Regions:
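Residue-level detector of bioactive/disordered segments in secreted/extracellular proteins
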Residues: 4-6, 21, 56, 72
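Short beta-strand segments enriched in hydrophobic/aromatic residues
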Residues: 45, 57, 109-111
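Hydrophobic pocket/interface hotspot
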Residues: 41, 53, 127
Length: 137
């Protein structure tokens, strides 16, 4: 009887451990991964690289970008004006806040319009740990 109980408990523990993919990494590792994901997201938008951009999004965010047409939606960003695409590439991360499997990043960039260069207002970007990596949500 004890052997059966042990097998049942071990099986249940193994099943629970497999739920949801790998656990969220430690804080320092998460911060580095989050910053990389956000900067890459903006770079792929600027480049109009839909395939790479969609790979950085959660399922929910991919659906919001057009679901099956997510890549095509982001590919269109390549038609933005050069100053807007450059502003996306120049994004800087100001703060990262992590709470369990969710994170919030505050960013800004520098934009030039009419010969005047200014810091943009902050933008808040949500992320979620999904499929073993931090993804823009």
């Amino acid at each position: 009887m004890r052997a059966c109980l042990a097998v049942v408990l071990l099986t249940a523990a193994a099943a629970l451990a497999g739920c949801g993919g790998p656990p969220v990494p430690d804080d320092a590792t998460s911060r580095a991964q989050i910053v990389r994901a956000v900067l890459a997201w903006h770079r792929y938008q600027a480049d109009g690289n839909g395939k790479a951009g969609c790979a950085l999004l959660t399922k929910r965010a991919r659906y919001a970008q057009g679901g099956a047409d997510c890549a095509r939606s982001i590919d269109r960003y390549a038609s933005f004006s050069a100053p807007i695409r450059q502003a996306l590439r120049d994004t800087k991360v100001d703060t990262v806040t992590i709470t369990n499997d969710q994170a919030t990043v505050v960013t800004h960039t520098i934009a030039t319009k009419g010969g005047v260069t200014r810091k943009t207002p902050p933008a808040t970007i949500p992320l979620r740990w999904e499929g073993g990596r931090w993804r823009v949500d």
